């Protein structure tokens, strides 16, 4: 996402020796990445995992017979499979369980309305059922939650902190995150449960609450749904469940946890191999020797793998990381390391796909253009094989749109022009890079993507527009001070203040946060609504947006990747579970 600094507006020629990098260097030496070795991918571990899957399936069948009409047990099973990251092994069992629950689902009452003693249990079951059914694209209305309010319009809650009530409030909080635009009751539920759960964590009278439940509460508040990606959630919940002695008394739960650990480590081994290929690709390129560019190939691999981790999407992941790495190089070039005239020539070279146009530019820009062409053409050839047709014209047009948006930002900064908020956002959505980044990845997911379906998941589709908007809003709301210090006059916050002189910077920041909250709800709707787009494509786009929320949670994790981002990489990609 471009940050055009003051030196972009200089008319003097820049040369390689005069360039200073303001970013920290590569944290992941190729020797270290190539040294990653683990026996967890050995055949005996795969065999043990396969055996556990069959054992658990048999236990599920037996348990579902024993519990008869116990809906909440079915919902708990679905939830734990998903939280531990092993749900892909039990798709049939999950479908059967949710179909059963949906048959008993009452749009007015949810799952049961009983006496005061059973109300908390029913409230918990209804909230758990609502969340699971909505995420699996069943038609359920949030109006069902209105039944769990008292005469004052507040959700039922006792004055004492009891474990079953904390569990209920946690379940309601998690359900409230899967909201659509205009669902007032969901906003009320989120506000109410956030306040309640925060008080639980900060209170002193929680001796009756299991420590594992408190760990779940802490995780839910720190990593809400839109920044809790599958691999991150799986690692966290494996650790939480492993400390829950009462939960582990069940034979089935022991098997489930063993499988979750095995599965995590087996996948991590596969991800090591992909990371090693990516690191070799980077270290052997000429661009890697240009030390003023950011080197974030490992960080970008983490971005994609935390959401799209399944073995069958290996090609997609590697392509995503390569394109994201290339985009960062271009970002740095347009941001800091090129004059306006050089950038115009570079952009024209991309439009014509012609290396000769940059012959008179400094060597580092020629190396950059070669890296751009080589990477793009390599992946265009991969796309042609996967999609069984030539997509080069479509891809080149998408690159053109992206770099024209960067050039527009460079021209604004050269003229010291602050555009209107609408002008900035329209261009900023394009310069977010999501259009080109997602395009290669979607085309390399291993399934044919006809033009009519591509239009529903890529530009100009609504879900793609929302992913682009998320990227722009996340970047601008978190990076404002950094951009300002770097000399960028045009940011979402500055443009909003210019349009609304009565607003403070804090008001403008809150406006962007409000837009982001609405975008999240619209993304939820686009994700769960039924259409002709295969779910794997929607999941990919959805998780790319969610990944940004995690990576930008504390700061721009790509720009400053030596803090939380480094910890994330060790947790997901380096350190196995024991």
Curated annotation (Swiss-Prot):
Gene3D superfamilies, per database record: Farnesyl Diphosphate Synthase, Terpene synthase, N-terminal domain
Record pathway: Sesquiterpene biosynthesis; Terpene metabolism; oleoresin biosynthesis
MF terms (GO), sorted A to Z: lyase activity; magnesium ion binding; terpene synthase activity
**Record flagged with keyword Transmembrane helix:** no
Q: What is its EC number?
A: 4.2.3.58
User: Does Cell cycle appear among the keywords?
Assistant: no
Which amino acids does the record list as binding Mg(2+) 2?
A: 331, 335
> So where does Mg(2+) 3 get bound?
475
BP term (GO), one: diterpenoid biosynthetic process
What are the alphabetically sorted keywords of the record?
A: Lyase, Magnesium, Metal-binding
Per UniProt, the short sequence motif DDXXD motif occupies residue numbers: 331-335
Q: What class of enzyme is it?
A: lyase
Task: Name any cofactors this protein relies on.
Answer: Mg(2+); Mn(2+)
Under Pfam families, the record lists: Terpene_synth, Terpene_synth_C
Give the residues the record marks as binding Mg(2+) 1. 331, 335
Give the reaction(s) catalysed. Answer: (2E,6E)-farnesyl diphosphate = longifolene + diphosphate
Q: Return the InterPro entries for the record.
A: Isoprenoid_synthase_dom_sf, Terpene_cyclase-like_1_C, Terpene_cyclase_plant_C1, Terpene_synth_N, Terpene_synth_N_sf, Terpene_synthase-like, Terpene_synthase_metal-bd, Terpenoid_cyclase/PrenylTrfase
* Cofactor binding description: Binds 3 Mg(2+) or Mn(2+) ions per subunit.
Q: What is known of its domains?
A: The Asp-Asp-Xaa-Xaa-Asp/Glu (DDXXD/E) motif is important for the catalytic activity, presumably through binding to Mg(2+).
Family, according to the entry, reads as follows: Belongs to the terpene synthase family. Tpsd subfamily.
Function per UniProt:
Terpene synthase (TPS) involved in the biosynthesis of sesquiterpene natural products included in conifer oleoresin secretions and volatile emissions; these compounds contribute to biotic and abiotic stress defense against herbivores and pathogens. Catalyzes the conversion of (2E,6E)-farnesyl diphosphate (FPP) to longifolene.
Can you name this protein? Answer: Longifolene synthase
Provenance organism: Picea engelmannii x Picea glauca (Hybrid white spruce)
Its gene?
TPS-Lonf
């Amino acid at each position: 996402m471009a940050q055009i600094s003051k030196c972009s507006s200089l008319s003097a020629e820049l040369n390689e020796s005069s360039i200073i990098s303001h970013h920290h260097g590569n944290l992941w030496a190729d020797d270290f990445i190539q040294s990653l070795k683990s026996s967890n991918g050995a055949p005996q571990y795969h065999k043990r995992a396969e055996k556990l899957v069959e054992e658990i399936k048999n236990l599920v069948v037996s348990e579902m017979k024993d519990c008869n009409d116990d809906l909440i047990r079915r919902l708990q099973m679905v939830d734990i499979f998903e939280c531990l990251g092993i749900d892909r092994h039990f798709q049939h069992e999950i479908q059967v369980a949710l179909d059963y629950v949906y048959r008993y689902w009452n749009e007015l009452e949810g799952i049961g309305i009983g006496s005061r003693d059973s109300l908390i249990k029913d409230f918990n079951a209804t909230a758990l059922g609502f969340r699971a059914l909505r995420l699996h694209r069943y038609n359920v209305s949030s109006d069902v939650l209105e039944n769990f309010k008292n005469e004052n319009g507040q959700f039922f809650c006792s004055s004492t902190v009891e474990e079953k009530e904390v569990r209920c409030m946690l379940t309601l909080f998690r359900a409230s995150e899967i909201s659509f635009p205009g669902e007032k009751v969901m906003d009320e539920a989120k506000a109410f449960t956030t306040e309640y759960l925060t008080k639980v964590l900060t209170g002193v009278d929680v001796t009756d609450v299991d420590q594992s439940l408190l760990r779940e509460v802490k995780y839910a508040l720190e990593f809400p749904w839109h920044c809790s990606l599958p691999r991150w959630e799986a690692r966290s919940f494996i650790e939480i469940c492993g400390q829950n002695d009462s939960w582990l008394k069940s034979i089935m739960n022991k098997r489930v946890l063993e499988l979750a650990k095995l599965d995590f480590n087996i996948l991590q081994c596969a991800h090591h191999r992909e990371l090693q290929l990516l690191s070799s690709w980077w270290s052997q390129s000429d661009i890697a020797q240009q030390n003023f560019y950011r080197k974030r190939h490992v960080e970008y691999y983490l971005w994609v793998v935390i959401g799209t981790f399944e073995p069958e999407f290996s090609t997609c992941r590697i392509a995503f990381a390569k394109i994201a790495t290339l985009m960062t190089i271009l970002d740095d070039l347009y941001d800091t390391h090129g004059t306006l005239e050089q950038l115009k020539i570079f952009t024209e070279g991309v439009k014509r796909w012609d290396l000769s146009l940059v012959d008179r530019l400094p060597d580092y820009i020629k190396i950059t253009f070669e890296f751009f062409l080589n990477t793009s053409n390599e992946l265009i050839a991969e796309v042609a094989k996967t999609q069984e047709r030539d997509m080069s014209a479509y891809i080149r047009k998408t690159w053109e749109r992206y770099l024209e948006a960067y050039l527009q930002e460079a021209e604004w900064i050269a003229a010291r022009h602050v555009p209107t908020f609408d002008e900035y956002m329209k261009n900023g959505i394009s310069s977010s890079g999501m259009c080109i980044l997602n395009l290669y990845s979607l085309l390399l997911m291993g399934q044919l993507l006809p033009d009519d379906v591509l239009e529903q998941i890529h530009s100009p589709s609504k879900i793609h527009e929302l992913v682009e908007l998320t990227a722009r809003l996340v970047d601008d709301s978190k990076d404002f001070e950094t951009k300002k210090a770097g000399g960028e006059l045009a940011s979402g916050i500055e443009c909003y203040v210019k349009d609304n002189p009565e607003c403070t910077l804090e008001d403008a920041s809150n406006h962007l946060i409000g837009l982001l909250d609405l975008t999240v709800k619209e993304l939820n709707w686009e994700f769960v609504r039924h259409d002709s787009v295969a779910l794997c494509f929607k999941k990919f786009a959805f998780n790319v947006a969610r990944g940004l929320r995690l990576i930008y949670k504390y700061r721009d994790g790509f720009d400053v990747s030596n803090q939380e981002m480094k910890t994330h990489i060790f947790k997901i990609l380096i350190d196995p579970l024991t």
